[in-house]
Amino acid sequence: GSEMCIRDSHYFLPKDISILIGLAVGVWITGALHEDGLADSADGFGAGWNPEQIRKIMKDSSIGVYGMLSLLFVMFIKFETLHSISVEQIPLVWIAGHAISRLAAIGLLIPLDYLGGSGNKSSSMVQLNHQDWLVAGISGILPVLLLGFQGFLAMIAILILNLGLSHYFKKRIGGVTGDCLGASQQLSE
């Protein structure tokens, strides 16, 4: 999807514009689901003092300063990262980033409780069986391995990031919400 927009549009548009189009298409395809999670998490954890207040802020449909800044910083980092590599590398890097970041997000469900709308443990979260984890693991890791040593370094960085997020989410609210998973996905991508 979005990686193909960059690959194909760079023939008649400047690389910068092609990357921006690719980012916009990616947001459009996902309905900004993960970006919304990042913004809500940034607002909640940035402005909230206790678990109840954090979750209340995260549920608020308006975006605050923390949320807006987090989106700007993450989009800028994505843009600069893609801009720093050759156009030929972008499709694989893009696919690998999407794949590993989604695996990283659901990986938070292993050590943490999923908190429902009330902030209590929720049984409504889809339970993944061993086959689901195997498919998620292979599809999340394989594209990154195709990047060689740089892909391996990226996986280590994402693992460290998500260990930190896991500790932070557990300490601040006692688990994860869907917004936390979206934040993890965006920060890992």
Where do the PLM segments sit?
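Helix-coil boundary and interhelical linker segments in multi-pass alpha-helical membrane proteins
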Residues: R7-I21, L69, F73-A96, L142-A154
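Transmembrane alpha-helical segments that form the membrane-embedded catalytic/substrate-channel core
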Residues: A24-H34, I95-L112, L159-F169
